[in-house]
UniProtKB/Swiss-Prot annotation:
This is Tumor necrosis factor alpha-induced protein 8-like protein 2. It is found in: Cytoplasm; Nucleus; Lysosome. Its main location: cytoplasm. May interact with CASP8; however, such result is unclear since could not reproduce the interaction with CASP8. Interacts with RAC1. The modification Phosphoserine is found at S3. The keyword Cell membrane does not apply. The gene is TNFAIP8L2. It comes from Otolemur garnettii.
């Protein structure tokens, strides 16, 4: 007997449509103004660090696509109880990473690239486990691309170095606001 689900088909179409339109207009449906400002700063950091505009655009576009798809899955009630526990764990790890990044930015001589890299790697692994049966291998590779890019010790060291002080300040301001508002 053939299994058909209009809900599943609609969700699949929604994910496909959103993957084709990962621009600002769609992102604003799922990503607030403060998050958008943080993403813009992460783009600038990536562009300056890699000296490649296309590479920086690709990593932020991948990040937005993943965030939108996970939001669609969550809002559509696609996650079971064990997956909701993983989603909670992911959010806690992401929050811990944000608080650690803030602490490193506010307290001189405390930065350790390995600590942030490990937290981002843990976030990646939990997120991959969360979406394992919901997203395609292409989306899984996007997740790896984003987290591997931002957990690069060289990039993290540059971000906390003197040349990126202004970017780091804006990122920390955004993270602080997201934490204060309970959005992270």
């Amino acid at each position: 007997m053939e299994s058909f689900s209009s809900k599943s088909l609609a969700l699949q179409a929604e994910k496909k449509l959103l993957s084709k339109m990962a621009g600002r207009s769609v992102a604003h449906l799922f990503i607030d103004e403060t998050s958008s400002e943080v993403l813009d700063e992460l783009y600038r950091v990536s562009k300056e660090y890699t000296h490649s505009r296309p590479q920086a655009q690709r990593v932020i576009k991948d990040l937005i696509k993943v965030a939108v798809k996970v939001a669609v899955l969550h809002r559509s009630g696609c996650f079971g109880s064990s997956e909701l526990a993983l989603a909670t764990r992911f959010r806690e790890k992401l929050r811990q990473g944000a608080m650690t990044a803030l602490s490193f930015g506010e307290v001189d001589f405390t930065f350790e690239a390995a600590v942030l890299a490990d937290l981002l790697t843990e976030c990646r692994d939990v997120l991959l486990e969360l979406v394992e049966r919901h997203l395609t291998p292409k989306s899984h590779s996007r997740i790896r691309h984003v987290f591997d890019h931002f957990s690069d010790p060289g990039l993290l060291t540059a971000l906390y170095g003197p040349e990126f002080t202004q970017h780091l300040g804006k990122i920390c301001d955004g993270l602080r606001k997201l934490l204060d508002e309970g959005k992270l």
